[in-house]
Every structure is written in structure tokens, then in C-alpha cells.
Amino acid sequence: MKKIRVSLLTKVVIAIAAGVLFGQFLPGGIARIFVTFNSLFGNFLSFSIPLIILGLVTPAIGDLGKGAGKLLLITALIAYGSTVFSGFFTFLSGSAIFPHILPTNTELTAMENPEDFMLTPYFVVNMPPLMDVMTALLLSFTIGLGLSNISGTTLRDSFTDFKEIIIKLIEVVIIPLLPLHIFGIFLNMTVSGQVMSIITMFLKVIIVIFVLHVLLLLIQFTIAGAIAGKNPLRLLKNMLPAYATALGTQSSAATIPVTLAQAVKNGVRENIAIFTVPLCATIHLAGSTMKIVACAMAIMIMAGEPVTFSNFSGFIMMLGITMVAAPGVPGGAIMAALGILQSMLGFNETLQALMIALYIAMDSFGTACNVTGDGAIAVVVDKIAGKN
């Protein structure tokens, strides 16, 4: 009998719906069992975040410098610039839109101290992390930059193995348990009587982000078309098969063959496309950055927290670097970003869970935005490379 595979998005949607449904009638004593699980999982997530940063960011920076040539540097800078532009474009757009469509100072404010208004766990197990998030980031940058400038491979190989362990941790432990964690969050919010405001926020934010990601693609291909002297709409149209494929796979890596073929169809030389597309599938996550920035802004506005350029500018710049390290699994980008959400924007476990749920709800077209934008970068790199 063929095993039926259920996507992470489907599991999250079911978890949200089940949490709202069961929260209507489930006795408090039984609900607290799931609250206890949430407490344990949240603490384990806090313990894991510095390890995730160290395991993903360090080898990503080290590998980026391995055999670094001029074209690699140019492609990486363009990808980073596109990702950061996406973040600031989203921030400016969200600042103009979200305050008018989202309620402020709602009960979400109480999530700064959830136990004041929600069910409490039966017991708590403290799981202190080995280091704080900023220490993990600084250590990752220091070791990663060092690895990219030495010829030895022993330490690089060790961090490559550690990266595999972290990816297994994400794929085998964290991602499978996320739906249950999200179920517990929405169950608890339903019991506390605030779930409808969250669901309404989700729908509004999803619509806004969908419109913004279409505008972002138009901007990316307008710039690429202007640089290469080609029709931007035709370039974008040729990339639509890659967009459609990514909607189904939810993976930039799995979409590489289609992205590659469509980039060549746009006139990119095959050797340039073979170099650019797989690299950008790893380091260019403009769509994911857009979702993370927009979701973070929406949640902070709902919580009555100040959303200012000063606290988001550094976050966006750091997010652009962090996205380089995001593993190519559904939900991988938001897992890589949890550390800076916690350290730079002050998100606690409950707000992080809301971020994960809201992010995964839009995972398909975020990935589609990423891979379609890769086609624009390939056109630009092909033009810069010239005849060489």
C-alpha cells in the first residue's frame, strides 16, 4: 500500500483548525497536557537555537569563500542586495499598510507573559542554552570567515558534519513536532478567548504579502531587463514554470532543474546558468525574507510593540546573512531566523510559534518568489560576465 505523504503546510493548517475546534470543549485538565508539551518543546527550541545558528551559519560562510572567484563574489553580493532590498521594501510597505488593517494593543500584548492569561503547564523543565544567540552569531561569523581563509580541511569537515547533525535535528525532531506545538498554542489561545483576532490577522497579512511578492518580482525583473537590455515581462513570463514548480515542491533546491532550463530560455549562457542557479537556490531568499519581515511586523503591531526603522534595519541586514544558512527543507528559513527574532526583536517562545505558523502558511509562494528571482539574478550575472 502506497504511503500517503502530507505536506507540512497541510499539517499546520490541520493543527490550527484542530486547536481552535478542540479549544471550544476540551476540559482544562486535558488541555494542560498539551500546554505542558508546549513548555517542554519551547524550552528545547530555545536550547537548540544557538546550536542551529552555529551549525548552519559557520559552514555556510566558510563554503562561500572556498574557491572564491570574482563571479562568485559578484553573485553573492547581488543575492544579498536583493534579499536586503526585499526586507526594506517589505518594511516600508508594511509600515504604510499594517497600522490601518491590524488592531493594536490587543490581548496579544499579554503574550509577553502568557501564564498571566493562559493555561499553565503541569511542570516545567529548564533547558538553558549553551550560549546566548548573539554569542552564537559572533562565533559563527568568526569561525566561518576563518574557514574561508585557510587551506586546512579538518575543522571545515567537522563543521560540515555538525551541519548534517543540525539538519537531521530540524528534519527529524523539530519539524515533525511543530504541528503539535502549533496545535497546543491555538488550543491555549482558544481557551483564553483571543484566537479569532489571530486568525483574522493571519488572513490579512497573507493577502498583503501575496501582493507585495508580485510587486517584488516585477521590480527584480524590471531591473534585470534594464541591465540586460531585454523585455522584463517576457523574462518574467519565461520563469513562470519555475514559479509553478516551486509552489508544489516548496523547495528551491528541488526546483533547480526547472529554474535552470528557464534561465537558459531567457538567453543566459548555460555555463553561467549552471553556476548561478544552484548558488542562488542556496543564498538568495528574497521571498522568505519578505515573509519573515512582514510577519514579524504584524505580530509586533498586534502586540502593541513599537515598529521602528531603527530596530528593523539591523534585523533586516542580519536576516540577509542568516538566510544564506537556511537549510533547504520546508520551514528551514524560519528555523534559521528564530535566533535573531529572539535576540534582536525580543520574540518569546509563544510569539516564535505564531511566526512559524504564519510563515509556513505561506511557504509555497515564498519559495516560488525565491526561485523566480533567481532567474533575474542569472540574467544580470550573465550580462556582467560578458564574453569571458
Where are these regions (language model features)?
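Transmembrane helix-bundle signature of multi-pass membrane transporters/permeases
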Residues: 40, 44, 57-58, 75-80, ...
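Short amphipathic alpha-helical coupling elements at transmembrane boundaries
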Residues: 32-46, 157-172, 237-245, 261-265, ...
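Signature of multi-pass transmembrane helix bundles
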Residues: 2-26, 39-48, 70-234
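Membrane-interface alpha-helices at helix entry/exit sites of multi-pass transporters
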Residues: 69-75, 168, 172-175, 265-281, ...
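Juxtamembrane helix-boundary/capping and inter-helix hinge elements in multi-pass membrane proteins
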Residues: 27, 60-70, 148-153, 161, ...
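Transmembrane alpha-helical segments and their short flanking loops
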Residues: 293-388
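Alpha-helical membrane segments and immediately flanking helix-loop junctions
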Residues: 111-112, 236-293, 320-334, 361-380
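Membrane-water interface of transmembrane alpha-helices in multipass transporters/channels
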Residues: 33, 69, 73, 195-203, ...
